[in-house]
């Protein structure tokens, strides 16, 4: 990677931990919170999300926890079979937002993955998410649309 990102002193100990199958219950709980926060129409329950996460981890995805001071503050789910890599899910716990934890976690993840390019999707109604990703330099490159018959 060309540039290493600087980490704020207050969270200089951001660690990236690759998840395994024993982490699926926590990943599913975080995923449910992500679905709520981004105002997704996904109706899945935590047990359903556990099954889906298990499928992700058994196929072409890797999940990573973000840890600060021995506390898990969030996670990322990355599709590893494409180029650039695809960041399917990124979540920072509500109590850890607003102190650059998301920014530092994202930069630490890029460094860990040793990439300088990554793709994401953000729901159009997720204004805080859109602002966050734009603040990191992301630009819109496509628009995903859906027709739902009433």
Predicted regions and their residues:
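A short beta-loop-alpha structural element at the N-terminal edge
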Residues: 13-29
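Conserved active-site alpha-helix within GNAT-family acetyltransferase domains
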Residues: 103, 124-143
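Conserved beta-strand in the GNAT
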Residues: 65, 71-79, 86, 91
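A short helix-loop-beta-strand connector motif used in the catalytic cores of GNAT acetyltransferases and
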Residues: 54-65
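Conserved GNAT-fold acetyl-CoA-binding loop/helix
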Residues: 31-53
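A conserved beta-turn-beta hairpin within the catalytic core of GNAT-like acetyltransferases
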Residues: 80-88, 97, 116, 140-142
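Conserved GNAT acetyl-CoA-binding A-motif
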Residues: 113-123
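Conserved acetyl-CoA pyrophosphate-binding loop and the N-cap/start of the following alpha-helix
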Residues: 96, 100-108
């Amino acid at each position: 990677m060309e540039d290493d990102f600087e980490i704020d002193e207050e969270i200089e100990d951001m660690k990236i931990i690759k998840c395994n199958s024993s982490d699926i219950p926590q990943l599913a709980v975080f995923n449910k919170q992500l679905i709520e926060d981004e105002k997704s129409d996904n109706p899945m329950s935590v047990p359903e999300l556990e099954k889906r996460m298990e499928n992700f981890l058994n196929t072409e995805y890797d999940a990573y926890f973000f840890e600060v001071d021995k506390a898990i503050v969030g996670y990322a789910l990355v599709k590893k079979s494409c180029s650039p890599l695809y960041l399917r899910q990124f979540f920072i716990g509500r109590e850890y937002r607003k102190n650059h934890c998301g920014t530092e976690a994202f930069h630490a993840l890029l460094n860990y993955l040793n990439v300088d390019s990554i793709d994401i999707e953000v729901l159009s109604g997720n204004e805080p998410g859109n602002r966050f990703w734009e603040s990191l330099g992301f630009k819109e490159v496509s628009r995903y649309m859906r027709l739902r018959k009433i």
